[in-house]
Amino acid sequence: MELSQLLNEIRANYEQLLTRNQIETVLSTRIQLEEDITKKMDKDGEALKAAQAELKEARRQCHHLQVEIESLHAVERGLENSLQASEQHYQMQLQDLESVIGRLERELQEVRRGIERQLREHEMLLNTKMRLEQEIATYRRLLEQEEIRYYGCIQGEKKEEKPTKSKVGFLLPSAIINEISFSTKVSQKYENENMETVTKQAVVNRDVKESAEAHGTIQTEKVDEVIKEWEGSFFKDNPRLRKKSVSLRFDLHLAATDEGCLESRQDNLPDIEVRLIMRRSCSIPSIKPPPGTN
């Protein structure tokens, strides 16, 4: 009785211990689970906060990027508009330049045609000038030949009448012809030989002109005598003139006559034309007459 009661008591205590242990185990397990859950919740909460902060930062960055993208789009649109405006502007300038180039090319062609036309006209004028110069030279040569033939015939006729006669005349400027007086002498030596020598000396305001010229046609064999006579007449007619203050130059050349005038004189020497030029020397002054003398 006592044993069964003891067993019952032991069984009851054991059951109580089991129940107590179970309860403690369950409680400890629950507490551990609650602690783990709490820790996990705390950790997850921190992670959630970090994720929320990251999300907020990402949203802020996304908004900033959106604003920047919009500004870039605006800049892009502005650049596109500026590009279109620049293209239109330069297209207009290009059209203007093309029109200017076309106009300048047309003007250049006109200038080239004008230059070619002027060159042709210049060539024509030059050819005309050359032809006119040739014609003028031809006419001048013909006139000189006719003049030489005419004077040759006249001189031939005079020489046939007075073959030993020589005439000399001075050529003076027309502007001072009214102020010039002449003195004339006839050489007795050549009068005896039937030869007349007319000497004219130019005197301006009682002084010999700076230059004077005489020419005449004489027989060839009388050249030396006539030249000496002419030279002496310059100083003989004006004693106040020194020979050192005057230089005399003699140019001799054959007188041109036509063939008809020379037919009758083939046996004689041809006449020559003598030209005497008197020039005052610049280094030696002449002696001027005292005032009041004639």
UniProtKB/Swiss-Prot annotation:
PROSITE patterns: IF_ROD_1, IF_ROD_2
One Pfam family from the record: Filament
InterPro entries, alphabetized: IF_conserved, IF_Keratin-like, IF_rod_dom, Keratin_I
Residue ranges of domain IF rod in the record: 1-150
Record's keyword annotation contains GTP-binding: no
UniProt feature coiled coil, ranges: 1-151
Keywords: Coiled coil, Intermediate filament, Keratin
Superkingdom of the source species: Eukaryota
Entry's Gene Ontology cellular component terms: intermediate filament
SUPFAM superfamilies in the cross-refs: Intermediate filament protein, coiled coil region (SSF64593)
GO molecular function: structural molecule activity
Keyword Lipid metabolism annotated: no
Similarity comment: family membership: Belongs to the intermediate filament family.
Protein name: Keratin-like protein KRT222
